[in-house]
Curated annotation (Swiss-Prot):
One of its GO terms (cellular component) is cytoplasm. The keyword Protein biosynthesis applies. Pfam families: EF-G_D2 (PF22042), EFG_C (PF00679), EFG_III (PF14492), EFG_IV (PF03764), GTP_EFTU (PF00009). This is Elongation factor G 1. Belongs to the TRAFAC class translation factor GTPase superfamily. Classic translation factor GTPase family. EF-G/EF-2 subfamily. GTP binds at residues 17-24, 81-85, 135-138. It comes from the Bacteria. The gene is fusA1. One of its GO terms (molecular function) is translation elongation factor activity. It comes from Anaeromyxobacter dehalogenans (strain 2CP-C).
C-alpha cells in the first residue's frame, strides 16, 4: 500500500495547557469539525472521545495522552491530547518528545497559569514550535490582551496576535482576522460549523489597524527582503506575511496567538487553519540524531527511503488486544507482521498488528511510514523511551529521562487472593508510566509505590481496582526525604580479616565534599602510584553507592555529594573486590556521620487563586504550613498567591482550602526543589524513622 498523504502535508502536534484551560474540549471540537465524530462530546457530561478512561470521565481531567488522526484541508493531522494536571507532567513530556508542533491553550481570564509554565518549559526543552489559543473568551472576566501580556511576562516568549476579539464575555461574537482584515462571526444553529466573513466593526477599526501594523513590523524583522519593503513604506502582501509567520513560528522567533471559545464553538476552525499554515511538517524539523552499536553518531532523515527507526513513547494496556505500544516513525517504513529490533533492550520483536488510533477506537492498517504515529500490538519487551529500528541498521535515538517520585505510599492487598494479582497489576502500571515506581521496603517488607503527587497515586490505585479487580489498602502518604552532608571530611575504610587461611583485606581513604543542591553524586578517583590497583576502584565506588541508599540519619537516600578516593593500601593475596566494596561502604558511613549530615525535604511551588475576601485566611494557613510567600498578584477579582511550601505540610490541603474558602479557591502545586528540614522538625522525623526501623527488626 503506497503512502496516501505526502510528508509535507503531515502535522504531528499536541494540545497542551493548564488543567481546565479547555484542552480536551478544544480537541473534541477539532474532531467534530474535521468530521471524525458526528456528535460533540462534552467534558461536563462525561461523553468525550479523547478522555476514554473511566476515571477521566468521572473527574473531567485528561490523564493519558490519547492519539488521534484527523484530516483538514488535505492535510493529515496526528493530534495528541495531553493532561494538564501537574501530577501527569510526565505524560506531557512524553508526547512533546515525539511531536513536531503544539497548540498551547490558555484561559482568557487567567492567562498563563503555573502548569502552563511547566509545559511551556518542556516544549522549549524539545524545541517544539507553538501556536497559542486564548480560549474561554465567553467567560466573565475574559481579557484577551491581558492573556497575551502574560505570555510575554511569565513565559518570556514573544506573542504575535493574529486576532482581535469582537466583544468579550457573553458579548463575544467572533474575531477580527488581522491577515485578511475581516471580521469572522459564527452560526449558532450549525454549532459553529458555518461562519461568515464580515466587515470589521467600526468600533474596532482603529485597534485592528494598530495590531495589523504591529504584525507587519514583527514579521518583517525576521526577513531582510520583507524588512527592506517595510522600511520603504510598502504594504506586505498576505502571501508574504503568511510565509514570514510560518518561518518565524518554525524558528520560534514568535508564537502566533488566536482567540475563541471552544465550548461555544467559536474559533476552532481557525486553529486548524493555523496548524496547517504555521506548524511544521516532519520535513521541517531537524533530522533525528542517535548513536549506533559502537557509539558513533548517526543521523536519520525523515524519509521513507531511509532505514526504519521509531521511538516508543507510550505503553497502554487495552482490554481487548493487550499491550499497545504507541510509537512515532522517524524514518523508513514498517509492515504489520514484520520484525523490528529494539536497540535499547537488544531484543528482536514481532509486530503483530498495526493500529491507527482514534482516541479509544481503532482502525487496523497494513503499513506505517516516516512521520506516522501509530500503535503496535504484540511487543512484549518494549517500554516507554525505547528505540525500534531495522536490525541491519541499528540506532539508539536519544532516551527520555523521567523524574524521581516525590511521594510514597505503602500498599497491601485486602485478601490473600489479591496478593498475586496486585503484583501483576503494579508491574503493568509501571510499564505504562515510568514516573510510577514500585519497590519493597527491605526492613518492613511492605510494598511501597511512589509517584508525582497524591492524585497520581490515587488514580493508579483506582485503576488497579477497575482494570485488574485488585482491592488494596493504602497507607498514609510518606514524603520522599533525602539526606546530605554539609562539610568536607576525610574518613578511613578498613576491612581486614586475617586469621589463618585466605583472609580479606580492603583499605581506603575517602574525602567527602558537599555539592550544591541538585548536583547529584560524583565519584573521583584520585589514587596515584597504584596504591590501590585499578580493578578495586570500581568495587569501592559500588560500596559507596550502596551505602548511599540508606543514609546515616534516618535511612533516607543520600544525595548531592562528591566522594574522592585519595589513598589506601592492598594485600597481594588477601585483597578482593568484596573486601574493597565493604571497605568503601564502611569508609563512607563513617565519613557521612562526621560530615554534619542534614535531612532534606521536597519543597513545592504552590499557586492559590482565591477571592479577595478569603485572602487573609489563605495566607495565614500557608504560613502555618511553613510556607514562604513570594508573590501576590491581583487578577480579575481574585488574588493569586505564589508560595513555596514543604510537601509534608500539603497533605489534605485541598479539603482544608475548600472549607476555608467555601470551595471558591483553587490551587495547583508542583515540585520545586529540595531544601534542608528545620532542626526541630528533623529531630522528630529521625526519631520516628529509627522507631519504625527498630520495630521492623
Amino acid at each position: 500500500m503506497a503512502r496516501t498523504t505526502p510528508l509535507e502535508r503531515y502535522r504531528n502536534f499536541g494540545i497542551m495547557a493548564h488543567i481546565d484551560a479547555g484542552k480536551t474540549t478544544t480537541t473534541e471540537r477539532i474532531l467534530f469539525y474535521t468530521g471524525v465524530t458526528h456528535k460533540i462530546g462534552e467534558v461536563h457530561e462525561g461523553t468525550t472521545v479523547m478522555d476514554w478512561m473511566e476515571q477521566e470521565r468521572e473527574r473531567g481531567i485528561t490523564i493519558t495522552s490519547a492519539a488521534t488522526t484527523a484530516f483538514w484541508r488535505d492535510h493529515r493531522l496526528n493530534i495528541i491530547d495531553t493532561p494538564g494536571h501537574v501530577d501527569f507532567t510526565i505524560e506531557v513530556e512524553r508526547s512533546l518528545r515525539v511531536l513536531d508542533g503544539a497548540c498551547a491553550v490558555f484561559d482568557a481570564v487567567q492567562g498563563v497559569q503555573p502548569q502552563s509554565e511547566t509545559v511551556w518549559r518542556q516544549a522549549d526543552k524539545y524545541e517544539v514550535p507553538r501556536i497559542c489559543f486564548i480560549n474561554k473568551m465567553d467567560r466573565v472576566g475574559a481579557d484577551y490582551f491581558h492573556a497575551v501580556d502574560t505570555i510575554r511576562e511569565k513565559l518570556g516568549a514573544r506573542p504575535l496576535p493574529l486576532h482581535v476579539p469582537i466583544g468579550a464575555e457573553d458579548k463575544f461574537r467572533g474575531m477580527v482576522d488581522l491577515l485578511k482584515m475581516k471580521g469572522i462571526t459564527f452560526d449558532d444553529e450549525t454549532m459553529g460549523a458555518k461562519y461568515q466573513e464580515v466587515e470589521i466593526p467600526a468600533d474596532l477599526a482603529a485597534q485592528a489597524k494598530e495590531y495589523r501594523a504591529k504584525l507587519e513590523e514583527t514579521v518583517a524583522e525576521i526577513d531582510d527582503e520583507l524588512m527592506a519593503k517595510y522600511l520603504d513604506g510598502k504594504p506586505l502582501s498576505n502571501d508574504e506575511l503568511m510565509r514570514g509567520i510560518r518561518r518565524g513560528t518554525l524558528e520560534m522567533k514568535f508564537f502566533p496567538v488566536l482567540c475563541g471559545t471552544a465550548f461555544k464553538n467559536k474559533g476552532v476552525q481557525q486553529i486548524l487553519d493555523a496548524v496547517v499554515d504555521f506548524l511544521p511538517s516532519p520535513v521541517d524539523i531537524p533530522a533525528m540524531k542517535g548513536v549506533d552499536a559502537k557509539g558513533n553518531d548517526v543521523v536519520r532523515k525523515t524519509s521513507d527511503a531511509e532505514p526504519f527507526s521509531a521511538l516508543a513513547f507510550k505503553i497502554m494496556n487495552d482490554p481487548f488486544v493487550g499491550n499497545l505500544t504507541f510509537f512515532r516513525v522517524y524514518s523508513g517504513r514498517l509492515e504489520a507482521g514484520s520484525y523490528v529490533y529494539n536497540s535499547t533492550k537488544d531484543k528482536k520483536e514481532r509486530i503483530g498488528r498495526l493500529l491507527q488510533m482514534h482516541a479509544n477506537k481503532r482502525e487496523e492498517i497494513k503499513e506505517v511510514y516516516a512521520g506516522d504515529i501509530a500503535a503496535a500490538v504484540g511487543l512484549r519487551a518494549s517500554t516507554t523511551g525505547d528505540t525500534l529500528c531495522a536490525e541491519d541498521a541499528p540506532v539508539i535515538l536519544e532516551r527520555m529521562e523521567f523524574p524521581e517520585p516525590v511521594i510514597h505510599i505503602a500498599i497491601e492487598p485486602k485478601t490473600k487472593g489479591d496478593q498475586d494479582k496486585m503484583g501483576v497489576a503494579l508491574q503493568r502500571l509501571q510499564m505504562e508510566d515510568p514516573s510510577f515506581r514500585v519497590h519493597t521496603d527491605e526492613e518492613t517488607g511492605q510494598t511501597i509505590i511512589g509517584g508525582m503527587g497524591e492524585l497520581h497515586l490515587e488514580i493508579l490505585v483506582d485503576r488497579m481496582f477497575r482494570e485488574f479487580k485488585v482491592e488494596a489498602n493504602v497507607g498514609k502518604p510518606q514524603v520522599a526525604y533525602r539526606e546530605t552532608i554539609t562539610r568536607t571530611v576525610e574518613a578511613e575504610g578498613r576491612y581486614i580479616r586475617q586469621t589463618g587461611g585466605r583472609g580479606q583485606y580492603g583499605h581506603c581513604w575517602l574525602r567527602l565534599h558537599p555539592q550544591e543542591p541538585g548536583k547529584g553524586f560524583e565519584f573521583e578517583n584520585a589514587i596515584v602510584g597504584g596504591v590501590i590497583p585499578k580493578e578495586f576502584i570500581s568495587p569501592i565506588q559500588k560500596g559507596i553507592e550502596e551505602a548511599m541508599t540508606s543514609g546515616v540519619l534516618a535511612g533516607y537516600p543520600m544525595v548531592d555529594l562528591k566522594v574522592e578516593l585519595f589513598d589506601g593500601s592492598y594485600h597481594d593475596v588477601d585483597s578482593s573486590e568484596m573486601a574493597f566494596k565493604i571497605a568503601g561502604s564502611m569508609g563512607f558511613k563513617e565519613g557521612a556521620a562526621k560530615a554534619s549530615p542534614v535531612l532534606l525535604e521536597p519543597i513545592m511551588a504552590v499557586e492559590v487563586t482565591t477571592p479577595d475576601d478569603y485572602m487573609g485566611d489563605v495566607i495565614g494557613d500557608l504560613n502555618s504550613r511553613r510556607g514562604k510567600i513570594h508573590a501576590m498578584n491581583p487578577r480579575a477579582g481574585v488574588q493569586v498567591i505564589e508560595a513555596h511550601v514543604p510537601l509534608a505540610e500539603m497533605f489534605g490541603y485541598a479539603t482544608d482550602l475548600r472549607s476555608k474558602t467555601q470551595g471558591r479557591a483553587t490551587y495547583s502545586m508542583q515540585f520545586a526543589h529540595y531544601a534542608q528540614v528545620p532542626a526541630s522538625i528533623a529531630e522528630t522525623i529521625v526519631t520516628k524513622a529509627k522507631g519504625v526501623a527498630a520495630g521492623a527488626k
